């Protein structure tokens, strides 16, 4: 079932124009491509939100939509404005009207020819074992960085000469039609600069940069985890002016077969024999640093959790220690010899279990029988 324009903007059908405008601003920000790079679902939602606003902000189109539905607006029902934004030249303009020049019109979104073709910083993904992440380690890594081409001054053009991009006519953006709406996107030929090399630099093959290799020894601190980033100063890309950015090392920590990590806490499921759970006992359990004593109380239950304080991971930013949580799994024998079977039968009888039924079970059956008789 197709979602309505009102549902897309999360408003009621009697919403006024100001409410529609505020709702559009909220949803457009939520699904804007700059905030959801690579998210196809968000991109589709963004297009639908713009489509909904275009209709509901126009009294005539809204009236047609309310009465006949979306299909009635197809086939020229949107008037003569081919942009589909009712007076806005492109997507940059519509955002500029709502959010100010920070989102930029088409002229503001165009990159300057003086812009760098490479960012100063970059991310390096570093895989660590479970133990390396928990206890820290030293790592020698080899990496590749980019250096702005000196031959063309980072332009990618022979002799550094650029011409106006013929595809976007120097605007840095091109229009892409989606049904009855035209969206603006960065020009694929000039990457938004509005300028293009008439002849590529032979040194960098038109890229504007060359690649070089480097290496560095890293001291990985104790307690890092997946997603954390460590900054390595002055190991990033080299820009036109000679400034070198930073490299950010992103940690990807492996999982362990025995221990489960949740931030600084460690979880483990540990088997306990049923007699140990019934009688209570001090048992040894493995920890990330060796072993620790767990005092099982009498009558411990299957799945019950116990906390071993400060047996977890050290916090990467302080001296605080996490805990280890032990969840017990009660195990029962799968086979018995004659002596064991006899002992268990005697134990069962000592608890008042006769004819395969415990006294509490008998009481329940009697209660149900009386219920049927009443």
Swiss-Prot record:
SUPFAM superfamilies: Chaperone J-domain (SSF46565), DnaJ/Hsp40 cysteine-rich domain (SSF57938), HSP40/DnaJ peptide-binding domain (SSF49493)
A single cellular component GO annotation: cytoplasm
Annotated Zn(2+) 2 binding sites: 165, 168, 187, 190
Zinc finger annotations (CR-type) as residue ranges: 136-213
Species: Campylobacter jejuni subsp. jejuni serotype O:23/36 (strain 81-176)
Gene Ontology molecular functions: ATP binding; heat shock protein binding; unfolded protein binding; zinc ion binding
Cofactor comment: Binds 2 Zn(2+) ions per monomer.
Entry cofactors: Zn(2+)
Pfam families, per database record: DnaJ, DnaJ_C, DnaJ_CXXCXGXG
Gene name tied to this protein: dnaJ
Coiled coil: none
Domain J: 4-69
Subunit (UniProt): Homodimer.
Protein name: Chaperone protein DnaJ
């Amino acid at each position: 079932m197709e979602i309505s324009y009102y549902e897309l903007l999360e408003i009621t059908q009697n919403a006024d124009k100001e409410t529609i405008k505020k709702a559009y601003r909220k949803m457009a920000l939520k699904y804007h491509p700059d905030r959801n790079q690579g998210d196809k679902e968000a991109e589709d939602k963004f297009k639908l939100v713009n489509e909904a606003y275009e209709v509901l902000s126009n009294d005539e189109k809204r009236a047609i939509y309310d009465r006949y539905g979306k299909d009635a607006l197809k086939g020229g029902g949107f008037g003569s404005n081919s942009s589909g934004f009712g007076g806005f030249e492109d997507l940059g303009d519509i955002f500029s009207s709502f959010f100010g020049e920070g989102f930029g019109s088409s002229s503001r979104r165009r990159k300057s020819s003086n812009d760098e073709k490479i960012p100063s910083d970059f991310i390096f993904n570093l895989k660590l074992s479970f133990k390396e992440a928990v206890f820290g380690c030293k790592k020698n890594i080899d990496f590749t960085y980019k250096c702005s081409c000196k031959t063309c001054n980072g332009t990618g053009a022979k002799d550094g000469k650029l011409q106006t991009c013929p595809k976007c006519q120097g605007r840095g953006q091109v229009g892409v039609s989606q049904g009855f709406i035209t969206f603006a996107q960065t020009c694929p030929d000039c990457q938004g600069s509005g300028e293009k090399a008439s002849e590529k630099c032979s040194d960098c093959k038109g890229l504007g940069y060359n690649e070089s290799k480097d290496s560095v020894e890293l001291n990985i601190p104790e307690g890092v985890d997946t997603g954390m980033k460590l900054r390595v100063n002055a190991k990033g890309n080299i820009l036109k002016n000679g400034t070198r950015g930073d490299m950010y090392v992103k940690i990807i920590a492996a999982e362990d077969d025995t221990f489960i990590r949740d931030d600084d806490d460690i979880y483990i499921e540990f088997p306990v024999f049923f007699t140990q759970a019934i009688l209570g006992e001090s048992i040894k359990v493995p920890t990330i640093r060796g072993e620790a004593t767990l005092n099982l109380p009498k009558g411990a239950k299957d799945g019950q959790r116990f906390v071993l304080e400060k047996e977890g991971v050290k916090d990467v930013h302080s001296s605080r220690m996490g805990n280890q949580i032990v969840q017990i799994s009660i195990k029962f024998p799968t086979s018995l010899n004659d002596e064991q079977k006899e002992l268990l039968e005697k134990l069962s009888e000592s608890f008042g279990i006769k004819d395969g039924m415990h006294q509490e079970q008998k009481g329940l059956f009697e209660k149900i029988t009386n219920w049927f008789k009443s």
